[in-house]
């Protein structure tokens, strides 16, 4: 048996400050245009279009270095690795919304709506497990899923009494995804090819995932 003595400062328990990263996330601008109208008291319609480029997400962090302009030790530095990842995997998203309502009678209204949302992921988007970023260094999980566009269709009716109203709606949300168990891009890298010649340039086929959803909602209300 041999006793080993370590200096008091050999191991330091991490404090809150050691595990805390203050960061700033700037989301992209959104451009939106819409129009709508009514025809007498019987028909109303509306259309809206929106665009947002998620590849322009920008992350920065506080490096606490001396800022000669501000005269202090607190400033924000752009997280280049994370911003490059956003640029390489995300893209502009288009959203279209349309809605129509027809008053069949003074009490009965019929409704129809449609939404389209394009996928924010690029077709060749991949999970990067190692990112030289202050916000995130390693990703322990290997699986990831790229989502497709969304199509949303709704229809319904509403009936109004003097103090009671009733609404019934059906909603269908259509979307799919491609699930990858791991990123196979590294199988073509030089060192991997040399170390694993039998697995060189191996690829994995994604699993198609059905994310369709059907929803029926019913509302009964009373006005006082």
For the regions a language model picked out, list residue spans one by one.
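Outer-membrane beta-barrel porins/channels
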Residues: 1-224
